[in-house]
Amino acid sequence: MNYSYPFSYDWSTQEIIDVIKFFEAIETVYEKGMEREKLMNIYRRFKEIVPSKSEEKKLCDEFEQASGYSSYRVMKKAKEAQNGDWIRME
């Protein structure tokens, strides 16, 4: 991993940590997979920090440019899945 995670200097240290946890979860879904409930809990916390759709899109686009991992596709798949499902990107 030779990239940095997008964040805002307006956030608290804990908020930055929680946003980074979200992007790390996206990486995990691509690399190993993750339980839907765990991913959704991490996403809910991310949305508490980033409630704006436009800011979410901006941050996720920056992350995808840097990493090649699509947060949008992961969350679309997770939202379509059922509780108990394992989410993994091919």
UniProtKB/Swiss-Prot annotation:
Signal peptide: none annotated. It comes from the Bacteria. Belongs to the UPF0223 family. This is UPF0223 protein GWCH70_0965. It comes from Geobacillus sp. (strain WCH70).
